[in-house]
């Protein structure tokens, strides 16, 4: 099933229809009618991700049984009359949804059901993301493509997709730890009585899981050391770190559903910064490891990164991890190795 809806508004805001501005880019989203996908689509269409001067075509992938729901979402997108939205593709075929894609947000994933072991979940998702990796390899725009994996286990799903796309640079794949990063910023701002924009040089190391390591040791608040400003290592170790690590579970316990709006917002932040840069500021991205800081080559591991204004990321170099940090780093590294081992027979 494949449906394309095109627009040609005549409003003054529609600069592209009047022959001005940029050509549209193609943004593919999997699990498009799900909770996170629903939150994402409207923000992308409004220009929150790529800017108010960038026309887009949304290319939505769903399961066959969810195509009617996707039709309803597409109707809502139509009804918003977004000037930047030049078309919508609805498909249950990965190669169609990824055709010519410049951006791909892989949101849809198999959730863990009652009684399911983690190894079973890994293998179920390995099958999904191997298919999607092959489809990206065959039909996406390899020269411009940026892939963000949101569906969990995100780091290992990114690894699987990338390994199944041998003709695409593995550095064009990433997994999302920006939600963890944003959660940490909010906790630190609250603790220090400051704005989130006052917090700098904070980062997430490792896996998007309960082993992730939110690291404040290099951080500053209004230019002053976070460690010195907080001056409470017990709070950092016993409150802050577990709160960030377990925030997703806490939200499920509170609302009965997993994070959706905050996850979508983090995905927007991740892709916007990866495209336009971070103005010299640190952010956290799970990216292809070349062995930096001892993270095994080939893993998708969260590092502190800076992105330049051309969209090229660089891992922050020269950081010295203390013993506590190194222990946390090693724990999350070992978990990622274990996950990779659990799906090794499905990796090319």
Curated annotation (Swiss-Prot):
Q: What GO cellular-component annotations does this UniProt entry give?
A: extracellular matrix; mitochondrion; phagocytic vesicle
**UniProt superkingdom:** Eukaryota
Pfam families annotated for this entry?
A: Ldh_1_C (PF02866), Ldh_1_N (PF00056)
Q: Where is the transit peptide?
A: 1-9
Task: Specify whether Oxidoreductase is a keyword of the entry.
Answer: yes
Could you identify this protein by its name?
Probable malate dehydrogenase 2, mitochondrial
Residue sites binding NAD(+) per the record: 31-37, 125, 132, 150-152
Classification via NCBIfam families = MalateDH-SF1, PRK05442.1
Task: Recall the taxonomic lineage recorded for the source organism.
Answer: Eukaryota, Amoebozoa, Evosea, Eumycetozoa, Dictyostelia
> Which compartments does it reside in?
Mitochondrion
Q: What are the UniProt keywords, alphabetically?
A: Mitochondrion, NAD, Oxidoreductase, Transit peptide, Tricarboxylic acid cycle
């Amino acid at each position: 099933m494949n449906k394309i809806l095109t627009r040609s508004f005549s409003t003054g805001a529609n600069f592209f229809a009047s022959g001005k501005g940029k050509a549209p880019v193609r943004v593919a989203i999997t699990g498009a009618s799900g909770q996170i996908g629903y939150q994402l689509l409207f923000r992308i269409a409004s220009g929150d991700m790529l800017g108010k001067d960038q026309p887009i075509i949304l290319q939505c992938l769903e399961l066959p049984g969810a195509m009617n729901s996707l039709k309803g979402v597409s109707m809502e997108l139509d009804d918003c009359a977004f000037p930047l939205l030049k078309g919508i593709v609805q498909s249950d075929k990965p190669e169609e949804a990824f055709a010519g894609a410049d951006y791909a947000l892989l949101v849809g994933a198999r959730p863990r059901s009652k009684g399911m072991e983690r190894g079973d979940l890994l293998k179920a998702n390995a099958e999904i993301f191997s298919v999607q990796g092959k489809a990206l390899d065959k039909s996406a725009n390899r020269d411009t493509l940026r892939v963000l994996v949101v569906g969990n286990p995100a780091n290992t799903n990114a690894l699987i997709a990338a390994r199944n796309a041998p003709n695409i640079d593995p550095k064009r794949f990433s997994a999302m730890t920006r939600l963890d990063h944003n959660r940490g910023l909010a906790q630190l701002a609250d603790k220090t009585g400051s704005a989130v924009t006052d917090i700098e040089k904070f980062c997430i190391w490792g896996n998007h899981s309960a082993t992730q390591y939110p690291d404040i040791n290099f951080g500053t608040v209004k230019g002053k050391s976070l460690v010195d400003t907080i001056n409470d290592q017990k709070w950092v170790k016993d409150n802050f770190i577990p709160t960030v690590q377990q925030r997703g579970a806490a939200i499920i316990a509170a609302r009965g559903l997993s994070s959706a709006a905050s996850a979508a917002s983090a995905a927007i932040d991740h892709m916007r910064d990866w495209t336009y840069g971070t103005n010299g500021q640190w952010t956290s991205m799970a990216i292809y490891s070349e062995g930096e800081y001892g993270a095994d080559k080939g893993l998708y591991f969260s590092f502190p990164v800076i992105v330049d204004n051309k969209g090229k990321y660089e891992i922050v170099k020269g950081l010295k991890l203390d013993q506590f940090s190194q222990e946390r780093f090693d724990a999350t590294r070992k978990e990622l190795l274990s996950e990779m081992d659990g799906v090794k027979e499905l990796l090319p």
